[in-house]
Amino acid sequence: MGEYGIAPGQRVAVIWDSSSPVEALKGLVDAVQASVGADSRVSVENINQLCQSAHRESSFDVILSGVVPGSTAQHSAEVLAEIARILKPGGRVLLKEPVVTESENNSQIKTAAKLPAALTLSGLVEVKGLQKEPLTAEEAQSVREHLGYQGNDLLIVQIEGRKPNFEVGSSSQLKLSFAKKTSPSGKPSVDPATAKLWTLSASDMNDEEMDLLDSDELLDSEDLKKPDPASLRAPSCKEKGKKKACKNCTCGLAEELEQEKKSSQPKSACGNCYLGDAFRCASCPYLGDACLQAWREDPAEREPAA
């Protein structure tokens, strides 16, 4: 059947509904069977039983739905999803459905714009309208009887969609190469004029006509003065209270505190502190310490007596 693009050997499904005339359905099935050949079987399914038929995935090359002359089938989202499931990758669906020109409340009939969108949402691609024409008197009467629509703004639309050339959820191995890419044998050519522009030779450096900037001229007398250590102290160093040098102090406070610590070390007045508590004064700061070998001014250098 050149009208529907059916070729010999293809598997075809014809979907009908209660509004399809029996004789017209039989004539369509016979014509499709003649086109595909005796070796191929044509499946005939009622639109209300399609989801319960449990066809295997990717079973049909072509699906014809609602194309029976006089049919007023309405395709729900579930029916369209099932059609997309049982189509083979790259398979085609051709359907007819009555639509309204303007959307109305409480109407189960789609508009001409919503029908292609419904096919796209079901997973079909390359959706395109093939034909749009007014209903015949018989088709309009069938719509009133089976769908209960009494309006006069109906059109019959013939639309086509295609399933993508892959299954939903399918995977494919990617060919990845982790080998190092070989660099080209020859270096890219460089424009001599560009190279000369960005090249400063030694002769240019010694050229008296070259006006080079002396970096020392960028400094004034204030920059060459040694700063006062007090001015380098962090703000926290100037706070009231106990002085405490920062870690890795660079302002000189650490050295100042160390010097104060050394100067505040107690000194022996009698010279007998190293002999032990028996020879120490009552106010001796070393009471309780072990005997010292020899008196040294620096307490860090004192060693207990052997």
From Swiss-Prot:
Chain spans, region Fe-S binding site A: 237-251
Pfam families, sorted: Anamorsin_N, CIAPIN1
Region annotated N-terminal SAM-like domain, chain positions: 6-172
GO biological process: apoptotic process; hemopoiesis; iron-sulfur cluster assembly; negative regulation of apoptotic process
Keywords: 2Fe-2S, 4Fe-4S, Apoptosis, Cytoplasm, Iron, Iron-sulfur, Metal-binding, Mitochondrion, Nucleus
GO MF, one example: metal ion binding
Signal peptide (UniProt feature, chain positions): none
Residues binding [4Fe-4S] cluster, per UniProt: C270, C273, C281, C284
Cofactor: [2Fe-2S] cluster; [4Fe-4S] cluster
GO cellular component annotations of the record: cytoplasm; mitochondrial intermembrane space; nucleus
Motif (Cx2C motif 2): 281-284
Family: Belongs to the anamorsin family.
Subunit and partners: Monomer. Interacts with NDOR1. Interacts with CHCHD4.
Protein name in UniProt: Anamorsin
Organism, as annotated: Gallus gallus (Chicken)
Gene: CIAPIN1
